[in-house]
């Protein structure tokens, strides 16, 4: 519908150029066509006249009137009016919305998919949990947001690569190995010889037992076997990392999250990428030495103070491999790089960008882009869920999935803006009622499937071609409300991709489900009149399709029965 209105406005602008109202060399402005906040202001509004007023040396409202007069007639537009300082509001005919139903039916799974990305490459990194323990609910929120964002970008025509960065070379891995070794030697977290910064969760005992019994872990095609030797710290380190990565991948698979690339921090050192990044920074002239340490002049690039890159003992600070890692993303040809992180990592953003800018390689400012999520509080029976002993102090993603479902967990972890704190109510997530938003939306999809089964059981032969031809019969308030919501879907997908906010898909699906349930309760679908029945079934099938398309972007199933 936006394309139709943009075409009409474009023709109106050409008419104003032809009659001299606008100078002949006036270029069409980058005007917007958007839905007003309230339906009283029409179905769509444009600011075209306000943008052209200066070129026309005219008052914006006067130019809006001229443009309104110059617009070609369209059977899909019932009224055009001027509002405010020069907005032009369009009221559409039911035929415009009825035609959108036909578009849904024709395009099917592709309805809502766009070409904004035009096949360009984008790398989306998310989760990137240290392989030192089970995934917790915060990792779950990162997984849900990141995976859905990747799906939304793919739907907008981007060539998406999903990436998981393993911090397998830091001090946390050393602490993990020491913790597993201590368990293998018979110590407990309360023992006097327990490592000072050791991990205390019961899962450490699971890793140690698997190592001592000589278990073999298949880590993405590489077999790692426990050597049973509690004194062999290096073997323990390799086995523990493989074991916990395998556990994390198991949870992610259950959560319907997968990746194209698993990138190991250790490979940055092995392949010389950290040293390469450091040498590029030195060569650019944005480093200096002081107190035996190598510093980055990060204040030249918006940081609040310069940062140490290499300490006096020769080791690198933690942000240097982060810079090196993102340099590889640039070298791998990502036009865009998006990193989803917990809000507690906010301080690293400026440093990483400063390091990349300081290399003077033509990397754009603001690259990579970041999506930050806030923490999650888990509630049951009105009280916060106590921290899990197995995980050593947090609620695991596996716990939530087992208590509710992957569908419910994904929905609730996506359904709010990432930068807002989130309360996950286990009781609500399990509820089979309209108060549960994921149930409410899935039930709308299942309800259509049920109606189609009932039609078959009653011996009604559904003729979709006939239904499309008879959509003009559906001009009542509730039918048009469903059609209006269906027409919004491509815009919502596009906006979610532009803003990197997949939660907008969830919000939209609730509104579509509400419109559908309201229509269903106020309109008998399986009526005796075949023309009316086919038209209503066609509207229901179109709704089913859009619900399925949107749920797929969230990684949530679209059940046929509930």
Curated annotation (Swiss-Prot):
Enzyme Commission number(s) of this protein: 6.1.1.19
GO molecular function, a single term: ATP binding
Protein localization: Cytoplasm
Catalytic activity as recorded in UniProt: tRNA(Arg) + L-arginine + ATP = L-arginyl-tRNA(Arg) + AMP + diphosphate
Xref: PROSITE patterns: AA_TRNA_LIGASE_I (PS00178)
InterPro entries in alphabetical order: aa-tRNA-synth_I_CS (IPR001412), Arg-tRNA-ligase (IPR001278), Arg-tRNA-synth_N (IPR005148), Arg-tRNA-synth_N_sf (IPR036695), ArgRS_core (IPR035684), DALR_anticod-bd (IPR008909), Rossmann-like_a/b/a_fold (IPR014729), tRNAsynth_Ia_anticodon-bd (IPR009080)
Listed GO biological process terms: arginyl-tRNA aminoacylation
CDD domains: ArgRS_core (cd00671)
Family recorded in the similarity comment: Belongs to the class-I aminoacyl-tRNA synthetase family.
Subunit structure: Monomer.
Official protein name in the record: Arginine--tRNA ligase
Organism (species): Xanthomonas oryzae pv. oryzae (strain KACC10331 / KXO85)
Underlying gene: argS
């Amino acid at each position: 519908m936006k394309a139709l209105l943009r075409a009409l406005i474009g023709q109106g602008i050409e008419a104003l150029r032809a009659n001299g109202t606008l100078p002949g060399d006036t270029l069409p402005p980058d005007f917007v066509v958007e839905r007003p906040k309230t339906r009283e202001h029409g179905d769509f509004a444009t600011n075209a006249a306000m943008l052209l007023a200066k070129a026309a040396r005219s008052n914006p409202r006067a130019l809006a009137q001229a443009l309104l007069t110059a617009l070609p007639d369209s059977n899909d537009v019932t009224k055009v009016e001027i509002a405010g300082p020069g907005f032009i509001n369009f009221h559409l005919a039911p035929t415009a919305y009825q035609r959108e139903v036909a578009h849904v039916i024709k395009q099917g799974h592709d309805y809502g998919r766009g070409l904004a990305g035009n096949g360009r490459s984008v790398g989306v990194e998310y989760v990137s949990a240290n392989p030192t323990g089970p995934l917790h609910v915060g990792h779950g929120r990162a997984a849900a947001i990141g995976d859905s964002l990747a799906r939304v970008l793919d739907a907008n025509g981007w060539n998406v690569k999903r990436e998981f960065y393993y911090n397998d070379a830091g001090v946390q891995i050393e602490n993990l190995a020491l913790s597993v070794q201590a368990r293998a030697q018979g110590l407990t977290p309360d023992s006097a010889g327990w490592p000072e910064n050791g991990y205390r969760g019961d899962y450490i005992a699971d890793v140690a037992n698997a190592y001592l019994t000589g278990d073999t872990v298949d880590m993405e095609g590489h077999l790692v076997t426990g050597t049973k030797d509690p004194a062999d710290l290096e073997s323990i380190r390799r086995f523990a990392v493989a074991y916990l990565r395998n556990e994390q991948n198991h949870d992610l698979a259950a959560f319907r999250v997968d990746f194209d690339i698993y990138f190991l921090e250790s490979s940055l050192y092995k392949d010389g990428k950290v040293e390469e990044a450091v040498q590029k920074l030195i060569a650019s002239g944005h480093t200096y030495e002081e107190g035996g340490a190598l510093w980055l002049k990060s204040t030249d690039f918006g940081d609040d103070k310069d940062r140490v890159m290499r300490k006096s003992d020769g080791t690198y600070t933690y942000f240097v491999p982060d810079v090196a890692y993102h340099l590889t993303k640039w070298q791998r040809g990502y036009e865009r790089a998006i990193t989803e992180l917990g809000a507690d990592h906010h301080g690293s953003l400026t440093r990483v960008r400063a390091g990349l800018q300081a290399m003077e390689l033509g990397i754009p400012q603001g690259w990579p882009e970041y999506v930050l999520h806030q923490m999650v509080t888990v509630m049951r029976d009105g009280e916060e869920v106590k921290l899990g002993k197995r995980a050593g102090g947090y609620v695991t993603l596996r716990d939530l999935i087992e208590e509710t479902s992957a569908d419910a967990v994904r929905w609730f972890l996506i359904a709010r803006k990432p930068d807002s704190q989130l309360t996950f109510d286990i009781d609500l997530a399990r509820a089979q009622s309209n108060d549960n938003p994921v149930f409410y939306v899935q039930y709308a999809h299942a309800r259509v499937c049920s109606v189609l089964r009932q039609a078959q059981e009653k011996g009604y032969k559904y003729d979709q071609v006939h239904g499309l031809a008879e959509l003009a019969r559906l001009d009542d308030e509730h039918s048009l409300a469903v059609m209006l919501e269906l027409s919004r879907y491509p815009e919502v997908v596009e906006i979610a991709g532009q803003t990197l906010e997949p939660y907008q898909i969830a919000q939209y699906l609730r509104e579509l489900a509400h419109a559908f349930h309201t229509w269903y309760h106020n309109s008998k679908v399986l009526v005796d009149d075949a023309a009316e029945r086919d038209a209503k079934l066609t509207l229901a099938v179109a709704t089913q399709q859009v619900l399925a398309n949107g749920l797929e972007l969230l990684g949530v199933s679209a059940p046929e029965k509930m």
